[in-house]
C-alpha cells in the first residue's frame, strides 16, 4: 500500500517558482558530425508525468542527460525550475537504464550510501529513507540485502534512492524493463502519487501501455519531436479506426490483406496471436471490402470488432510517414518443419519440482505443438522460470512426464540440442567478444554447416541494423541492439523448437515489430515457440497463453479466450481529481481494482456495469469529486492477469513478498 501525505516537499529550499518545471528551447546536441538532438522544444508542468517515446537512437537518453545536468548541450536552453539544468543537478533525480544497486548492501545501507554521496545529513537520510520505505510498503525489507529483492522491489528501492535528495524533477529512463506486471502497476501507482504531490516526472519507455499512464507524450524521431499531446489526442490525430479480425487463417489472411495495405481502404495490417488488427478510415466500407477479398481468396469469414487505435498504431503510422519503419529482411531458410505441423513439440504431464520442502511447480500439464507460439506468463515467484528450465531439459523434474522435440528422454544429447534454440534474458552473448566472434561461436555450438554460416551472419547483421559493424565489441552495444543479435544467434540453425525468455526486453517499438514478424515466420514454417514476457501487451502476439500462479497453471487459452473467461467489467472515469478519486475507491474496496491511466481512472467491477457505474458515481460525488464522463472499456490482459493474481492472494494461495 502507498500512503499519501501530499506534503508537496519536492524541491524544498528553493525560491518560489511558478513557471513550467522544465523548459527546453531549441536544444541541440552533437557528437562530432552526428546530431543526436536537433532543435527540440517542450515544457513540462509541475506535477505532470511526461513521456518520451521513440526508437533507439531517437535522442531520448541525450535529452535526459542534458536535463539531469550531467552533459552540456551543444546549443539551446534546458531549464529546470527556472534555472539552467547544469546549475540544478542537486534538484534532479535521475534513474538511468543501468542504475545499479549494491547487492551486498542492505536496503537501508543503499539508501544511506546514495544520501551520503549527495551530502545529506545522516539523520536526515534515515528520516527520509524511512518515510519513502513506508510510502512504498518496503519498511519491513530495510535490513534485507538488495541482491535478494525481486525485480519489482529493486526498482522501488532505486526509486527511493533517487527520491532521498528530494528533487524537484524526476527523470526515469526505461525504469520497468524486466519487471513483472503486478510490480509494474505498483511502480506506476507510486509515480502517480508522487506527481499528485507536486513532483514533476519525465519517463522514457519503449512500452505503449506505460505511455498510456502519462499525462502527455512526446514522440521523438531522429533527434526531433514530431508530436506532443495527451494519449487520447494522439490516438484521435490519426483519423483512423482499428478493426480486429478474428480468424483461424491468420497467415493467409495477413498475406492477402497486406498486399492491399496503403491502397486507401487499409492503412496498416498487424498480426497478433489470435487476430489481425487493421487501421482504416471508413470502418463499414472496410468491413465490406475485407469480406469480399477474403471470400474471393477462398478464406473463411472473420469475426470483426471495432475499437480505437492504440498508441503503438500512432507511433508506427507516424514512423512510416517519416521513412523510419524497419522492413523485414528475408531469412535464408535451409530447413522446413511443415511436416511436423500440429504434432506435440513440448509436452508435460503432472510436472512437479520441489526444492527441499518447497514446491516451486505443482502438477503442470501442457502441450505445445509445432507451428504454435505459446506464451507462459506469471508474476515473480510464480514458477515459470523453473518450468521452462524443466521443459527445455536444463532441470530434472521431481515428478511427472515430459517430451521434447519428439524425445521422451536424453534432452541433453547433441541430437536434441541441435533441434532447440534458446535465448536467455540474463545471458545470451559474450560481451568481451566481437559481434562476429559471438556469431561464429554460436554457429559452431549449434552445428550450422560451414557453407551456410556467412549468409546467416549477414542476415543477423542486417536484421540487427549492424551492417559493417561485425568487428564491434558486443559489450558496447545498447541493450536493444544486443537483443537483436542474441535473437539471431538463437535461430541461425533454424531450430524446430525455440525458447525465448523476455526476447524483446528493452527493444524499441519498431524493432519489436520486426522481432515478432520473424517469430511468426518461424512458426508458419512449423517451429514451436515458447515465449515468456512480462509485457502483457506483447503477450497478445501469442496463439495461446498459460498463466501461472503459485507454481500452478491456472488459466490457458488464446488471448481472447482468457479475457472472455474472466467475469466483470472495466469502467473508465474522467473526473476532476483523479488521484484523490483513486485513493478513495481503493479505501472503499480492493486496491487492485483501481488503476490510473494519466488523467483517467479504470475501475474493475464484478457487478452489473450500469449499476456499478451509478453506485460509484454517487460515491465519488458524495466525496466531492465531479464525474465528467464514464464509459465501459474492454478488459486488457493486464486487467485479467492482475485480477487472477490478486484473487489468488486474497484466497491465501500466494502471499506478499517476504
PLM regions with names:
Residues 76-88, 400-408, 415-416:
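Conserved ABC transporter NBD signature motif
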Residues 112, 116, 123-141, 440, ...:
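Conserved ABC ATPase "signature" region
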Residues 145-149, 473-477:
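Conserved ABC ATPase signature
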Residues 170-173, 498-501:
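Catalytic Walker B motif of ABC-type/P-loop ATPase nucleotide-binding domains
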Amino acid at each position: 500500500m502507498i500512503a499519501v501525505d501530499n506534503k508537496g516537499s519536492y524541491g524544498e529550499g528553493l525560491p518560489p517558482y511558478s513557471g513550467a518545471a522544465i523548459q527546453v528551447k531549441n536544444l541541440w546536441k552533437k557528437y562530432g558530425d552526428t546530431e543526436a538532438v536537433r532543435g527540440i522544444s517542450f515544457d513540462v508542468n509541475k506535477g505532470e508525468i511526461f513521456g518520451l517515446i521513440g526508437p533507439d537512437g531517437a535522442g531520448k537518453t541525450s535529452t535526459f542527460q542534458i536535463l539531469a545536468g550531467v552533459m552540456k548541450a551543444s546549443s539551446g536552453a534546458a531549464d529546470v525550475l527556472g534555472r539552467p539544468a547544469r546549475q540544478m543537478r542537486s534538484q534532479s533525480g535521475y534513474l538511468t537504464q543501468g542504475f545499479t544497486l549494491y547487492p551486498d548492501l542492505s536496503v537501508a545501507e543503499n539508501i544511506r550510501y546514495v544520501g551520503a554521496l549527495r551530502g545529506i545529513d545522516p539523520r536526515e537520510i534515515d528520516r527520509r529513507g524511512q518515510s519513502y520505505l513506508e510510502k512504498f510498503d518496503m519498511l519491513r525489507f530495510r535490513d534485507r540485502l538488495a541482491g535478494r529483492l525481486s525485480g519489482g522491489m529493486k526498482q522501488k528501492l532505486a526509486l527511493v534512492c533517487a527520491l532521498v535528495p528530494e528533487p524537484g524533477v524526476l527523470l526515469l529512463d526505461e525504469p520497468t524493463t524486466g519487471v513483472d506486471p503486478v510490480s509494474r502497476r505498483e511502480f506506476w501507482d507510486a509515480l502517480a502519487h508522487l506527481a499528485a504531490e507536486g513532483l514533476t516526472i519525465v519517463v522514457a519507455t519503449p512500452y505503449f501501455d506505460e505511455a498510456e499512464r502519462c499525462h502527455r507524450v512526446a514522440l521523438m524521431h531522429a533527434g526531433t519531436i514530431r508530436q506532443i499531446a495527451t494519449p487520447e489526442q494522439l490516438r484521435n490525430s490519426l483519423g483512423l479506426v482499428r478493426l480486429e479480425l478474428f480468424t483461424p487463417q491468420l497467415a493467409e489472411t495477413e498475406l492477402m490483406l497486406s498486399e492491399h495495405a496503403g491502397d486507401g481502404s487499409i492503412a496498416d495490417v498487424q498480426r497478433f496471436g489470435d487476430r489481425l488488427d487493421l487501421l482504416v478510415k471508413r470502418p463499414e466500407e472496410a468491413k465490406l471490402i475485407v469480406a469480399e477479398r477474403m471470400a474471393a481468396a477462398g478464406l473463411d469469414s472473420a469475426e470483426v470488432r471495432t475499437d480505437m487505435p492504440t498508441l503503438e498504431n500512432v507511433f508506427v503510422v507516424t514512423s512510416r510517414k517519416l521513412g523510419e519503419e524497419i522492413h523485414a529482411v528475408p531469412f535464408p531458410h535451409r530447413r522446413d518443419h511443415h511436416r511436423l505441423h500440429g504434432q506435440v513439440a513440448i509436452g508435460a504431464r503432472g510436472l512437479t519440482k520441489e526444492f527441499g520442502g518447497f514446491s516451486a511447480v505443482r502438477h503442470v500439464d501442457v502441450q505445445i505443438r509445432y507451428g504454435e507460439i505459446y506464451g507462459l506468463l506469471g508474476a515473480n515467484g510464480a514458477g515459470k522460470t523453473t518450468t521452462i528450465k524443466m521443459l527445455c531439459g536444463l532441470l530434472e523434474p521431481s515428478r511427472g512426464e515430459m517430451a521434447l522435440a519428439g524425445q521422451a528422454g536424453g534432452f541433453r544429447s547433441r541430437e536434441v540440442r541441435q533441434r532447440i534454440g534458446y535465448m536467455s534474458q540474463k545471458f545470451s552473448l559474450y560481451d568481451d567478444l566481437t559481434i562476429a566472434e559471438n556469431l561464429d561461436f554460436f554457429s559452431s555450438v549449434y552445428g550450422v554447416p560451414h557453407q551456410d554460416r556467412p549468409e546467416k551472419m549477414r542476415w543477423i547483421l542486417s536484421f540487427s541494423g549492424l551492417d559493417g559493424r561485425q568487428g564491434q565489441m558486443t559489450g558496447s552495444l545498447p541493450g536493444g541492439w544486443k537483443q537483436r543479435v542474441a535473437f539471431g544467434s538463437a535461430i541461425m540453425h533454424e531450430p524446430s523448437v525455440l525458447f525465448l525468455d523476455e526476447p524483446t526486453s528493452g527493444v524499441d517499438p519498431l524493432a519489436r515489430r520486426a522481432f515478432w514478424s520473424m517469430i511468426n515466420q518461424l512458426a508458419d514454417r512449423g517451429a514451436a515457440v515458447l515465449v515468456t514476457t512480462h509485457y502483457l501487451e506483447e503477450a497478445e502476439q501469442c496463439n495461446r497463453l498459460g498463466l501461472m500462479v503459485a507454481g500452478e497453471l491456472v488459466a490457458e487459452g488464446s488471448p481472447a479466450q482468457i479475457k472472455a473467461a474472466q467475469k466483470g467489467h472495466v469502467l473508465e472515469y474522467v473526473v476532476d481529481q483523479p488521484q484523490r478519486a483513486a485513493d478513495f475507491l481503493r479505501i472503499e474496496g480492493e486496491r487492485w481494482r483501481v488503476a490510473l491511466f494519466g488523467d483517467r481512472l479504470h475501475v474493475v467491477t464484478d457487478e452489473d456495469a450500469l449499476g456499478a457505474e451509478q453506485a460509484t458515481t454517487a460515491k465519488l460525488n458524495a466525496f466531492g469529486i465531479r464525474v465528467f464522463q464514464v464509459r465501459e472499456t474492454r478488459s486488457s490482459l493486464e486487467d485479467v492477469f492482475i485480477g487472477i493474481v490478486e484473487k489468488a492472494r486474497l484466497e491465501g494461495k500466494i502471499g506478499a513478498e517476504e
